A protein has these predicted regions:
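Short alpha-helical segment immediately N-terminal to, or the first helix within
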Residues: 45, 215-216
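Short, highly charged C-terminal tails/helix-capping segments
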Residues: 195, 245-258
Length: 262
């Protein structure tokens, strides 16, 4: 047989992993489900313990399950989330020595596109504006609470990606947003113990810019909304980077953020 025509046969462990993966992505296994013991799973699939162990390792490497140790441990299902993408992205960026401003530039290119799509949604007044307005109202109420107002502001930006209506862009932009969120959250936590936090006037100015974005989305002004987002990012990132410096993208920060969702 021509070697070029030979197709590698999947290992048995890969076939078992594929069946379990299908159960997860189809929703038959949901986030937080505890899989049966490996011995019981092996009997279900008719495979040996080493084969079952390897199948579990495959799924663990994909982030679909987490093996927890201890008396009440086991393999716990984790449905893929945008936070998983952010962790993988952070790993690649950190390995290549990429600094946080690089992520900022990417956000300046991609977030306005999300905002434009939000403004173009026919159901924006029902599906988009109320969510953004609710986050904005809570941020206004918490404007004197250093860490809380930063967290709500980051939720606002993440919502712009989440609500854009395009699944692929939502994942790409959402991962970038969470890369930035992890670093900005860390900076905010440290700054809350010193003089590094922006004064009240600057916080109100940032929230006024959020309000303008909401207003233009509600009006269906796609280009105006995108421009407002672009201008706001330029201002807010300049301030954040001035305070945070020029750090390399940090994987542990991403893992901490991911764990907060589990």
């Amino acid at each position: 047989m021509n070697p070029m025509l030979q197709v590698r046969q999947p290992r048995l462990a890969e076939l078992v992993a594929a069946q379990l993966r299908e159960r997860i992505v189809s929703g038959r296994l949901v986030d937080g489900d505890l899989l049966p013991k490996q011995e019981d799973l092996g009997q279900q699939f008719g495979v040996s313990k080493p084969t079952m162990r390897e199948a579990i390792r495959i799924l663990e490497s994909e982030g679909l399950i987490e093996v927890q140790q201890g008396r009440f441990g086991g393999a716990v299902v984790h449905v893929p989330k945008v936070e998983n993408i952010a962790v993988s992205m952070a790993l690649v960026l950190e390995t290549n020595g990429v600094h946080l401003p690089d992520v900022g530039v990417a956000l300046q290119a991609i977030e306005p596109s999300c905002v434009r799509l939000c403004a173009q949604r026919e159901d924006r007044l029902e599906a988009v504006v109320p969510v953004l307005q609710n986050l904005h109202d809570h941020a206004l109420a918490a404007v004197r609470d250093d860490e809380r107002v930063v967290a709500l502001s980051r939720e606002f930006h993440e919502a712009l990606a989440e609500l854009c209506g395009n699944a692929s862009l939502r994942l790409c932009a959402g991962a970038l947003e969470r890369l930035w969120t992890a670093h900005e959250g860390s900076w905010a936590e440290q700054a809350s113990y010193g003089p590094g936090f922006p004064e009240l006037r600057i916080r109100h100015e940032a929230l006024d810019e959020h309000a303008l974005i909401i207003e233009r989305i509600a009006a269906g002004d796609a280009e105006g909304a995108a421009e407002a987002a672009r201008a706001h990012l330029g201002t807010s990132q300049t301030y954040a980077l001035h305070r945070a410096g020029n750090p390399i993208v940090d994987v542990p920060l991403q893992r901490r953020l991911l764990n907060s969702f589990h």
